[in-house]
Amino acid sequence: LRQSIEMIAKLPLIAVYSYHSYRHFRKDETLFIRNPQRGLSLAENILLMLRPDGKYTELEAKVLDIALILHAEHGGGNNSTFTTHVVTSSGTDTYSSIAASIGSLKGPRHGGANLKVQNMFEDIKANVKDWSDEKEVENYLRKILDKEAFDHTGLIYGMGHAVYTLSDPREVILKRFARELAQEKGMMKEFALYELVERLGGSLVMEQRRLFKNVCANVDFYSGFVYTMLGIPKELFTPIFAIARIPGWSAHRLEEILNASKIIRPAYKYVGHHAGFVPYEERTPEEGCEEVLRDLEKGAATEAAGETGENTEKEAPEAAKERSEEKE
């Protein structure tokens, strides 16, 4: 418990100070370090330490506080929290358990989702001339779904959730505060674009994928926009998520320690082809095995050549041609 409380208190400092160090040593910008102040909330101290002038409005601190609360916990089924349970069950220490959870959260399918949303909207704003033109926005979203635009994955980021269909209650709350902050910042035009994409995106995803259940926006849809309005750099999007989720991870870790006595060992079911045992002396090379072995040998040779600086680019087309002729 003591270690968990210490991490809740110290991770904001580690994240913000690390970012300032990154700015200074990588971007040659001014390094400034500001100590947290007693009596301020965690959200207030983050804004205080992050900004050069240390100033923030009451609404800014309130919105960040709400965002942290909404991200603090979301059940034991999400990837990073389940990681907390699994690693804790091995009997390891608090720091190792939380480090593993942070490693999970770092993945773009988990904690990095809001950054994907923000990058997608930057792409939309750069390629859609009239943000209020519903038809133009819809056409560009269709291009995204058809893998013709943005990152060519066919995904509208921030839309859909593994559990929620009608609505993500966290998104509903965060959207309300995002509107208030957008009004204060004079960014209602951007907020209107987010609303339009939210309204069109769900139905377009359902249509394109032929889904029968509703597709709603999730909490990542507005969180990146909120962080941007607060002046939080993209490099801190996922660390802010980790700062928020530390209390939830800590609670789950304590729960695992108190209620479980065995290590978690998931069961696996083999879904491949079941082949009978063949004695070694009766085995014959399967069709295609020689080709696979040649590819593996060539890959090893290419890797070795790469380490010594040898250029192997010219060999690739010849190898491909050779394989093509063999198949014919």
Annotate each predicted stretch with a short phrase.
Residues 1-318, 322, 326-328:
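Non-transmembrane, aqueous-exposed alpha-helical and coiled segments at domain scale
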